[in-house]
Structure formats: structure tokens, C-alpha cells
């Protein structure tokens, strides 16, 4: 089961990257990997997606295109879009 506290703490090292771009830190990429490892079922993916979306909404200056590029920059195949605008039920 995925809870948002876990997702938030996994993504917290990514906040400077998400707000400013550049290169994500190793800790940030470890967090992205951790979310991937938790997201093994459709329900888990949807829950993680909702947590990510809620977290993203707390940062009005978050750059959506930077957020969406995060899994690629970390070389993690994440099946969850990192965005404020995702329809999580469509996953």
C-alpha cells in the first residue's frame, strides 16, 4: 500500500530540481526509483499518482515540463507522470 508520506519523503530531495531545473541529485533519483518499486499494481500506481499530483500542487512555481522529464533524467522507467495535470484514474 502506498501512502503520501512515503511518496513525499521520496520526492523531497527533488524539490530544488523541480523548481529550478538542472540536474536531479542522486538522492532525488533514489526517491524516483523507490516510487517505481512501490508502484507494482494499477491501484498502487493510481495512489502514487494522486500523491505526486497533490505534492506538485503545493508548489505553484513547479515547472511541469521539468517535472515530467525527471524519470528520464534519473534513467528510471516510471509509469506515473509527474505532473499537476495528470488524470490518475486513466492509469
From Swiss-Prot:
This is Non-specific lipid-transfer protein 1. It holds the Pfam family Tryp_alpha_amyl. Belongs to the plant LTP family. Keywords: Disulfide bond, Lipid-binding, Transport. Detected in seeds (at protein level). The lineage of its organism: Eukaryota, Viridiplantae, Streptophyta, Embryophyta, Tracheophyta. Disulfide bonds join 4-51, 14-28, 29-74, 49-88. Plant non-specific lipid-transfer proteins transfer phospholipids as well as galactolipids across membranes. May play a role in wax or cutin deposition in the cell walls of expanding epidermal cells and certain secretory tissues. It comes from Carum carvi (Caraway). InterPro entries: Bifun_inhib/LTP/seed_sf (IPR036312), Bifunc_inhib/LTP/seed_store (IPR016140), Plant_nsLTP (IPR000528). CDD domains: nsLTP1. Displays antioxidant and antiproliferative activity. Exhibits antiproliferative activity towards the breast cancer cell lines MDA-MB-231 (IC(50)= 52.93 uM) and MCF-7 (IC(50)= 44.76 uM). GO terms for molecular function: lipid binding. One of its GO terms (biological process) is lipid transport. It comes from the Eukaryota.
